[in-house]
C-alpha cells in the first residue's frame, strides 16, 4: 500500500444560512471555487487529477444531479476529470477524503481532490419527503427519524449533562474561536469568494440584492457571555437544555482537499502537509446519535495500535454541546487538546463540508505546534460515528 499525503486543503468562509452572504450562492459553485484555489495555489495541471469526490448531507435540489461531477466540470478540472457524490451526513467530507485516500493507497489513483459542501439555505426547506419514512423503521427504530436537536436532548437527559455545563462549553468554543480568528489562524485555509446575496428590510419586507465578499467566518459571536447563553430558551423541548447558543449554527460553505501519493507529491515538488493514517465508522443507537465518536474512536485507535494519550489534537464536529461533553469525558480526552480553536458551535456546521474543514485546520494546527497525531471525528445522523487519523509531516 502506498503512503497517502494531504498536500493542501482550502475552504470558503462560513456564512449564516438564509441571512448570510451565501444565501444566493449555489453549492456547486462554492465547491468549484475551492477546487480552483487548490489548482492555483499548487500550480497543479488538472490533467493529473484522477477524480473529484464531494460529500453532501443532502443530495437533492441544488445538491442533486451528482454534484461531484458538476463541481469537476464547473471548475478548472474540466470534462476529462470524473466526479462522484456521497452522503454520510455530517461525516460526508471526511468520508470523501477517506475514499480518495484508499483509492490512492491501493494504486488505482495518484491525485484526487475530495471534500464536501452544504448550502443549507438552498436545500433545507425544499427536501423531497415523498415516501421518506419506512413504516417498519418508524415502528421499530423511530429514533432514526428524530431531528438532530431531539437526539441532543436525549443525550443530555440520559447522561446527566446539565444546561450549565453545555453553556460553559459553548462559551469556551466561542472564546477559543475568537482568539484564533483574531490571531489569523484561519486565514491560510480560507479562500475569499465574491458573492451576490439577498437582504430583507425587517420593517418594510423589501428585498434587495447586494454584492459582497466572504473572506472570513461570519457565524461566530465573539461577545458571547454566560449570562447571555443562560437567557436563551430551549430550542427543541419546553423543559429542555439544548438552545441556539449551545448548538451548532445553520451555515453554508464548502471545503476541498488535495490528496496524492507521497511519491507523486515529491515528484511534483509539492510539500506534503500530513499523512492519512486511517478511517473507521461505527454504529450506535439512532436516538443518541451524538455519541457516535465514543464507538468509532476506539475502533480507529485499536486498528492503529494507539491510545487516547497518543493523540496530540482532537477535532470533533461539535454539533451540540451535550454530545461534545459526553464524548470528551467518556473517552477521557484532555480538554486542552480538544477543539483548541473552537468548533462548530462557534464556527458553523455546513453538514457535508465540516469533515474537510476539520482536516484542513487540524493539519495546520499540528504543524504550528510541532505535534504528530491528530484525530478528526464526528457524530452522524442515523446513529453513527466516524473518525480519521492524520499524522503531520514535520
Locations of regions flagged by a protein language model:
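Short, well-ordered amphipathic alpha-helical segments that serve as non-catalytic structural scaffolds
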Residues: 27-43, 67-71, 96, 148-155, ...
Amino acid at each position: 500500500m502506498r503512503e497517502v499525503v494531504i498536500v493542501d486543503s482550502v475552504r470558503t468562509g462560513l456564512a449564516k444560512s438564509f441571512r448570510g452572504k451565501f444565501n444566493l450562492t449555489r453549492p456547486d459553485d462554492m465547491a468549484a471555487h475551492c477546487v480552483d484555489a487548490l489548482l492555483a495555489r499548487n500550480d497543479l495541471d488538472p490533467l493529473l487529477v484522477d477524480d473529484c469526490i464531494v460529500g453532501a448531507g443532502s443530495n437533492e435540489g441544488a445538491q442533486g444531479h451528482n454534484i461531484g461531477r458538476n463541481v469537476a466540470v464547473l471548475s478548472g478540472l474540466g470534462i476529462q476529470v470524473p466526479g462522484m457524490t456521497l452522503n454520510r451526513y455530517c461525516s460526508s467530507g471526511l468520508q470523501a477524503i477517506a475514499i480518495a485516500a484508499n483509492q490512492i493507497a491501493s494504486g488505482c489513483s495518484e491525485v484526487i481532490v475530495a471534500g464536501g459542501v452544504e448550502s443549507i439555505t438552498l436545500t433545507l426547506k425544499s427536501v423531497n419527503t415523498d415516501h421518506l419514512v419506512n413504516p417498519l423503521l418508524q415502528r421499530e427504530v423511530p429514533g432514526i427519524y428524530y431531528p438532530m436537536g431531539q437526539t441532543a436532548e436525549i443525550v443530555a437527559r440520559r447522561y446527566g449533562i446539565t444546561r450549565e455545563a453545555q453553556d460553559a462549553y459553548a462559551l469556551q468554543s466561542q472564546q477559543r474561536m475568537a482568539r484564533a480568528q483574531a490571531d489569523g489562524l484561519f486565514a491560510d485555509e480560507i479562500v475569499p469568494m465574491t458573492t451576490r446575496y439577498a437582504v430583507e428590510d425587517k420593517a418594510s419586507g423589501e428585498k434587495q440584492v447586494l454584492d459582497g465578499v466572504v473572506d472570513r467566518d461570519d457565524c461566530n459571536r465573539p461577545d458571547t457571555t454566560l449570562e447571555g447563553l443562560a437567557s436563551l430558551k430551549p430550542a427543541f423541548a419546553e423543559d429542555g437544555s439544548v438552545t441556539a447558543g449551545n448548538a451548532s449554527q445553520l451555515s453554508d460553505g464548502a471545503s476541498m482537499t488535495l490528496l496524492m501519493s507521497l511519491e507523486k507529491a515529491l515528484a511534483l515538488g509539492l510539500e506534503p502537509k500530513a499523512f492519512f493514517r486511517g478511517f473507521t465508522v461505527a454504529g450506535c443507537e439512532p436516538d443518541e446519535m451524538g455519541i457516535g465518536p465514543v464507538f468509532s474512536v476506539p475502533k480507529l485507535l485499536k486498528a492503529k495500535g494507539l491510545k487516547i494519550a497518543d493523540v496530540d489534537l482532537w477535532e470533533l464536529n461539535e454539533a451540540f454541546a451535550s454530545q461534545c461533553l459526553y464524548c470528551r469525558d467518556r473517552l477521557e480526552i484532555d480538554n486542552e487538546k480538544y477543539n483548541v480553536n473552537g468548533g462548530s458551535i462557534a464556527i458553523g456546521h455546513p453538514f457535508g463540508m465540516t469533515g474537510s474543514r476539520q482536516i484542513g485546520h487540524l493539519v495546520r494546527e499540528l504543524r504550528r505546534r510541532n505535534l504528530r497525531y491528530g484525530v478528526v471525528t464526528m457524530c452522524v445522523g442515523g446513529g453513527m460515528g466516524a473518525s480519521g487519523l492524520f499524522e503531520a509531516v514535520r
